[in-house]
Amino acid sequence: MAALSLSVSTVKPLSDRVFVKVNASEEKTAGGLYLPDTAKEKPQVGEVVALGPGKRNEDGSRQELEIKVGDKVLYSKYAGTDIKLGTEEYVLLSEKDILAVVI
């Protein structure tokens, strides 16, 4: 069996799913102390890198997503599925898990 190679360009979300590149969490405190991985808070901000086509309405048409690729978004802390591609962290979310677009 051939190995599966994933990259951002090969991930295409379905339905109302949103693929978000997670902003790195702080490595050290304001006082200069380095934080161990167990003490870091899970990031809640990231950049949208891919969108699904939207959820289907009862009449079969698609409901367009309110966000677009490139938007910086704030999402629920424990929402979605965490995915690591190379050294980068991503999260696959449902549109309803996105709380706001950060301007």
Curated annotation (Swiss-Prot):
Assigned GO CC terms: cytoplasm
Pfam families linked: Cpn10
GO biological-process terms attached to the record: chaperone cofactor-dependent protein refolding
Location relative to the cell: Cytoplasm
Disulfide bonds, paired cysteine numbers: none
Kinase among keywords: no
Family that this chain belongs to: Belongs to the GroES chaperonin family.
Quaternary context: Heptamer of 7 subunits arranged in a ring. Interacts with the chaperonin GroEL.
Protein name as catalogued: Co-chaperonin GroES
